Amino acid sequence: ITDQKSSGRCWLFTGLNVMRAKAIAKHNLGSFEFSQTYPFFFDQLEKANLFLQGIIDTSSKPMDDKMVEWLFRNPLSDGGTFTGVADIVSKYGLVPKDVMPETNSSENTSRMAGLIALKLREQGLQLRDLAAQGVKPAALEKTKTEMLSTIYRMLVLNLGVPPTEFTWTEYNAKGEPVSTEIYTPLSFLKKYGDEKLIDNYVMLMNDPSREYYKCYEIDYDRHRYDGKNWTYVNLPIEDIKEMAISSLKDSTMMYFSCDVGKFLNSDRGHAGCQKLRLRISYGYFFWHEQEATYPKFCQWLQSRHDSYGRRS
């Protein structure tokens, strides 16, 4: 069992667990985890770049423009989707957990996230001021790079220095050493992970508010500026259930997200039963047959990510 502690990294833990299960089975490994801190480091750095570049791209728009407002309200977060796992891991690779372990800030992200967000907002205002003064794009890009070096340093202080090369010993299920080799994060990904995450997986969604059997893309919901937006095929829940059952039967890990924040009783581990208790208390259900309207009322904005067969 892996534990994200007090952080929003469920998407990352789940994505890594899908690859982790395959690595353990393929190489007959004993106790093994990929480092969650390593890709999280670069996820935060890439999101900082996404924000700053977004500020440059919208610098001609007024501060009360909806996009500009949204950027300053959401400079970065520790949440994400499988698209982020694919984009970050394919670019930066993977390392074992003992090479870059958890830190207090990775397990409790709120303080670090708040400080980085504060710095990014400050930097965003500086970039807008420079753009208003007529500074050329090349100079803005240079300033942005300098700003990112500050964010990099903040991440190092909180998460540690990401390794570029490391020596690691593989142990089998009996605890016996099998091999000791020198790796880079990308060579480790090639041997123990999945180099083609972007090509090998498709995201599915049950979104009752939109037409089924079509592909949808959520603009600016990505982890890298040059990455892929959150893109999914919208299917009826019955179709997704069939795929989930098939994944369980053939022991293939299936990454999934669900909107567990609604009517959740975390003490009892129940989801949905809270609706019944609310009806007993209040005399009526809360939108029990109107889930298709949830997105329109901003009632369906955050999901929880897990993998079948292994808790995240």
Describe each model-derived feature in a short phrase.
Residues 1-6, 12-299, 312:
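Structured alpha-helical subdomains that flank or immediately precede key functional sites
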Residues 302:
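Short coil/loop residues immediately preceding or within conserved phosphate-binding loops
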Residues 306-308:
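Residues located in well-ordered beta-strands
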